[in-house]
Amino acid sequence: MTIFGSNIVSTHVDLTTALTRDLLLHQAMLRLAAEPNALFLGQNVQYDGNVMFKHLDGIPVSQRLELPVAEEMQMGMSIGLALQGFLPINIYPRLDFLMLAMNQLVNHLDKLVLMSKGEFNPKVIIRTKVGSTRPLNAGPQHTQDHFEALRLMLESVRGLKITSPS
């Protein structure tokens, strides 16, 4: 499982850095989409509604599954899809929303290898954004940065790899 977070806290990012980061994130999503079993799921994966939507440009709609705001269900669905051979790429528009899926992440996905005696080792990719105030300020609920605290907690989760582009 990989958590791929965009840690963008500063509101003062120069244009070249922002464009380079956007290009890299878009290319990463296209690379994942090249996998025949890849499925992107979450809020605003089929309809523009957040800044992460633009990184899905060029990915076929048939590889996107639009979901309601139900973060724990989304993670649970991803685990089930992974067990069926899919490569689920979860899109959580904000880190705050990922925290609502922690039950599935640490109590189910983390333990499936042990519970199945090694028969199942589901792969799930999670994409989220941390503390962004651009292109719009989302207010006090969605601009805090708990990434470091979450990273420290998730270091104990087996098979988890956390990446964060600078």
Model regions: which residues?
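Thiamine diphosphate
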Residues: M1-S166
